[in-house]
Each structure stands twice: as C-alpha cells, then as structure tokens.
Amino acid sequence: MTSQRTRERLIQRLYDEGLSNPQVLEVIRRTPRHLFVDEALAHRAYEDTALPIGHNQTISQPYMVARMSELLLAAGPLDKVLEIGTGSGYQTAVLSQLVERVFSVERIKVLQDRAKERLQELNLRNVVFRWGDGWEGWPALAPYNGIIVTAVATDIPQALLDQLAPGGRLVIPVGAGEVQQLMLIIREEQGFARHVLGAVRFVPLLNGPLA
C-alpha cells in the first residue's frame, strides 16, 4: 500500500479538497510518508488521516500538512522557516523541500532523534534541530520569514510573534480541547493581522523539554 498509485490517490484527494499549489502537491507526492510512521501502520501511510507516533503525539493529516505549507508560501518563496514541533519529521521534510532553511524545535528528544535519522536517510540537509520548549521559539536565530506550529496553543505565544520578521507569516492552531481554530498571523508595519481559517484538531503544545 505504499505504491505510487496510493500516493497519486492521496494527491488527487488533496486537489479535490481545494489544495492547488503545484509545488506543495509535488513535494507531498514524492515524500515517502510511510517512512515516518511505525512499520505496523505503513499500510495506512497514504490515507488522509493523522496517525499515532508514540508519546501521545501524531503525524499530521496530509491535508493539514499541505494546507499549512500553502499558507506559509502564499506570499512567495521563503528562505528561513521556524517549525515548532518536529514530531515524526514529516512536516519538516516537506518544508525542507519548499524553503531554503528550516529550524525545527521539539521537546521530546526521542522523537527528534528519529526525525533526524529519517531526514538524513532522505538526504535533506537544510534542517537544523533544537531540543527545547516550543513556546520559546528559537530567539537566537530570529527573525524568521515563516513560523509553523504543529500543535495547538491555548493562546498565541508572544515569543513567536516577536521572532517573526516584517511581512512574515505565522500559521498556528489556537484553542483547547474540542474548540480549536487554525490561524494565520501576518506581521505588518502597524502590528499583526490575524485571520481565523476554520476548525482543526491538534495535540496540545506543551511547555518544557522532555527527555
């Protein structure tokens, strides 16, 4: 079930659901999602659904990975993107093929180590990893043209707003429990423009690094 045919079916479904950026769709097509899930779930890798990866975390639904990537790229190419929540490394791998450099923060060390190995196997070398608290971002390397958060925050972390470059775009799920909204925040000259894009479902963004 990891054949090219199953990948093509996934891409067609994403297109049918309104995703249209050809660059994003091509990267989703060629990125082997089955390498980012447990072997027992590999036969489900190209379903449009989130799957468990251990440690109460999930690999995001392909639709959401593609949509968040499209939102980041909507204003043009990006050279420096911060990802909060490496997780399986799948979103990281997709981003690394769409932007010049990715800086990815993960609080669960074992997940980060696995993600590093997978990206090395795929020869994706433009990603730098940090083990730490995603709420803090990565201030030492700021600012970023784009920031993507792959877990739901109860509110928008001020640290991430501070690390966004002028004109930069932050894509983040915000809320708690069953009430979560995907938001796009753009840094403008006079402040931040905030756009609510619809209901989503993500695991929570937690504080502090975890061994």
From Swiss-Prot:
Active-site residues (renumbered): 60
GO BP term (any one): protein modification process
Localization in the cell: Cytoplasm
EC number: 2.1.1.77
InterPro entries reported in the protein's UniProt record: PCMT, SAM-dependent_MTases_sf
Top-level EC class as recorded in UniProt: transferase
Domain of life of the organism encoding this protein: Bacteria
One Gene Ontology term, aspect cellular component: cytoplasm
Role description: Catalyzes the methyl esterification of L-isoaspartyl residues in peptides and proteins that result from spontaneous decomposition of normal L-aspartyl and L-asparaginyl residues. It plays a role in the repair and/or degradation of damaged proteins.
NCBIfam families: pimt, PRK00312.1
Name of the protein in its database record: Protein-L-isoaspartate O-methyltransferase
Organism whose genome encodes this protein: Pseudomonas fluorescens (strain ATCC BAA-477 / NRRL B-23932 / Pf-5)
